[in-house]
Amino acid sequence: MDTNSRNRLIKSASYLSVTTALIILSIKLYAWVVTDSQSILAALIDSMLDITSSFINLIALRFALQPPDHHHRFGYEKLQDLTIFSQSIFFFASAFFVGFSSVKSLFEKTKPENISDGTTVMYVCIFLTIILVFYQTYVIKKTGSEIVKADKLHYFTDLLTNVIVIISINLSDYFWFVDPLFGVVISLYIFHSSYSLFKKAFKNLVDHELPEQDRQKIISIVNNHLGAKGMHEMKTRYAGQKAFIQCHLEMDGNMSLYNAHKISDEIAFEILQEFPEAEIIIHQDPFGIEEHVKYREYIVR
């Protein structure tokens, strides 16, 4: 798939996400007003975060998908990480709010009202969310977009939340504590999901190295090329879903620059098969010169 087609698909998923979130938010607001249910309130807050996240994604995509320019020669991919990081903070705040409100209802022993209206509304929300999640899954399969993956997690969480809400408000007729208790459970789930997003985005923002298994793939590729005698100063990072890989490749010092360049290109090509669209910088060094070597990768010969 070419870049323009990929970008169009990602943007279409974001537009559909915002539209669906607006509709669901309006429906849940009505449901909460007529039922006064804590679990519906939790679902409403979750939807408010979904729509906030979707708007942030839409704005970020406007910039993150732009090609590198004169002032941003590494590109704009880190905007994706900044977006996901911001979303996780919103989620932390919402988890606290929902948890606090639900615990308060547990102490006050409140029960929801107009349960049949609330149930009908939640079924409509489930139907709309399923359509959106199916389309997002299709877009992810075609593009691998991290922003759409994060957005899908929000709405998949929303889908589970809606099912839980239907169960809780219908059980609350028999057990008063079920509705606020499910509100607490949902808040804990939101907190857990937030932490996963926060951790990944934070690692990318501070230029954390690629996972060790990915680093070993790179080392193995270099190790399998007979022209490489060693490697040092390997540095890796992610920005959005794009990998940045650089290293100093050690080769026979008597080799011509042309052959050294050819070997570097061959190794870069093999790395690209494992990390499509990665930006790779390979510096050629003569083997045996230890000056300025800070750390060396282990190469088997």
Curated annotation (Swiss-Prot):
It is found in: Cell membrane. The keyword Nuclease does not apply. GO terms for biological process: intracellular zinc ion homeostasis. This is Protein p34. NCBIfam families: CDF (TIGR01297). GO terms for molecular function: cadmium ion transmembrane transporter activity; ferrous iron transmembrane transporter activity; zinc efflux antiporter activity. The chain crosses the membrane at residues 15-35, 40-60, 83-103, 120-140, 171-191. Its main location: membrane. It is a multi-pass membrane protein. It comes from Rickettsia rickettsii (strain Sheila Smith). Keywords: Cell membrane, Membrane, Transmembrane, Transmembrane helix, Transport. One of its GO terms (cellular component) is plasma membrane. Belongs to the cation diffusion facilitator (CDF) transporter (TC 2.A.4) family. The keyword Transmembrane helix applies. SUPFAM superfamilies: Cation efflux protein cytoplasmic domain-like (SSF160240), Cation efflux protein transmembrane domain-like (SSF161111).
